[in-house]
A protein has these predicted regions:
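Small/polar loops that bind or transfer phosphate-bearing groups
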Residues: 7-11, 35, 57-58, 81-85
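Short amphipathic alpha-helical segments
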Residues: 19-21, 45-47, 93-96, 115
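A general structural signal for well-ordered alpha-helical segments in protein cores
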Residues: 16, 43-44, 66, 118, ...
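N-terminal Rossmann-like dinucleotide-binding module
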Residues: 1-41
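Short, well-structured alpha-helical segments in soluble
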Residues: 67-77
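Short, surface-exposed acidic-centric catalytic microdomains
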Residues: 26-68
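Hydrophobic beta-strand scaffold residues
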Residues: 30, 53-55, 80, 101, ...
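Donor/substrate-binding cores of folate-linked one-carbon enzymes
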Residues: 36, 82-201, 205-213
Length: 216
């Protein structure tokens, strides 16, 4: 496995850990997990057990944080950087990994750009919610969409409930997306939209459709 991937995490790191556990199956080599100070304390031991480099960035002034993140990412020779990050990434890092950095956003972009997307979805009374994996560009949550998943909301359903429903689709979608990148199937058309070569589009709840079967 020569497709080298780095992960930047602010919370529990469930998606990153799942990718590391399934690395051989999806054809990636996890190289580094960079954790914000808010990230789960168990991530370091998990990375140690799985022979993945680990860096925790303490609470720092913004300029110092950006510098530490940049140094930690660029020190590695990475093919792809995956963000499940609460912070906006500095333009210098976005430029360095242009076209090779993706983000997981808990909403159906271009709706609910920015923070607290699930809470805002609940407050507006939408009937459907979901998650988006997209390319990272300097403008927040404005990069080309790679994949999306969709769930319907029940009567008076709270965001923590439909957030759990979303995650059931988000995890396999995330793993499959890494596999698409690793196998060189992701490309851009003349309008700058991202597509996956030979993938099946138009289905629900995930588009493009998942090709690898992952255990529940």
């Amino acid at each position: 496995m020569s497709f080298k991937v780095g992960f930047c995490v602010s919370g529990k790191g469930r998606l990153a850990m799942s990718a590391i556990r399934n690395a051989q199956r999806i054809g990636i080599k996890p190289c580094i997990l960079i954790a914000e100070h808010t990230a789960d304390q168990l991530l370091e031991s998990f990375c140690c057990e799985n022979e993945v480099n680990f860096v925790r960035i303490p609470k720092l002034p913004r300029v110092d944080f950006d510098q530490k993140l940049y140094e930690s990412c660029t020190k590695q020779v990475l093919d792809l950087v995956c963000l499940t990050f609460d912070k906006i990434v500095a333009p210098r890092l976005v430029e360095y990994y242009k076209g090779r950095i993706i983000n997981v956003h808990p909403a159906l972009l271009p709706a609910f750009i920015g923070t607290k997307a699930l809470e805002r979805a609940e407050s507006t009374g939408v009937r459907f919610a979901g998650a988006t994996i997209h390319e990272v560009v300097e403008e927040v949550d404005a990069g080309a969409i790679v994949a999306q998943c969709l769930v319907s909301l029940g009567y008076m359903e709270k965001y923590n409930s439909f957030g759990s429903k979303i995650y059931k689709h988000l995890e396999p979608m995330f793993l499959q997306t890494l596999n698409w990148y690793a196998t060189g199937r992701v490309f851009k058309d003349e309008k700058g939209r991202i597509w996956v070569r030979n993938a099946v589009y138009g289905g629900i709840p995930i588009s493009p459709e998942i090709e690898i079967k992952f255990p529940e």
